[in-house]
Amino acid sequence: MIFTEITDDLTGAADSGSYFTARGRRLKICVSGDCDLSREDGQLLSVNLSSRNTPKDTARSLHRSLCEKLPHHGNTIFMKKIGTGFRGNDAYELEGLLQAWPDYLVFIIDNAPDLGTFTLYGHQYCEGQILPKSVYAKDPIFPPKESFIPDILGHDTNIPIGLVDIDAVKGGSLVEKTRAEIKRGCRILVFDAITRADTLHIIESLQPLYPKVFWTGSLGMADGLAQYLLSLIHI
């Protein structure tokens, strides 16, 4: 299985990449989309687009253009790294990815258990605080004003956004709820996740069923995907 990560800043590429290298994987970080995107056998690839603070249309076009350079097939796991607290051009970046590859979906799992960050009933919490009251409320550029992720993204995109809440994740109806949201026309799905186990459960349950997905999130997503890739090696 091939792995490619797309990030919106270089620090995020290094931070999220550390979860893979800590598990013994080799990682190549490209500082821009104009770099050589080739890789050695078994090497993971992370491409930084520095799009967090660019104009919105630029963020969209950078992601669309990168997809046009990458292999388009189902044996690659893609991760889209975003900043905790949705303090950037996330909706525009996701639009660019989905415009380039109309047969793909976006699955968002935004949690980082070590930092007290999680998603519950679609609302983002950071360091245990609801997003607008969290430490990110002091962000000088993108201070969050609301916490419900589908609404945050929905202000900047017309792509239908669905929610798979914690009741489905923990209650045994994860696959059924995901299928229903996709059937409803949603191309972006937000998943509740509180613990590491939640994230890994979502990935393990859905990746074999939906190989054409941009797995989107922050450090918790990187941790979950790194563990999932490790399990594939040991099968």
PLM regions and their residue ranges:
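A C-terminal functional module that forms or caps the active site or interfaces directly
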Residues: 196, 216-224
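Cap/lid and interdomain-hinge subdomains that line or gate substrate/regulatory clefts
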Residues: 1-2, 26-30, 43, 59, ...
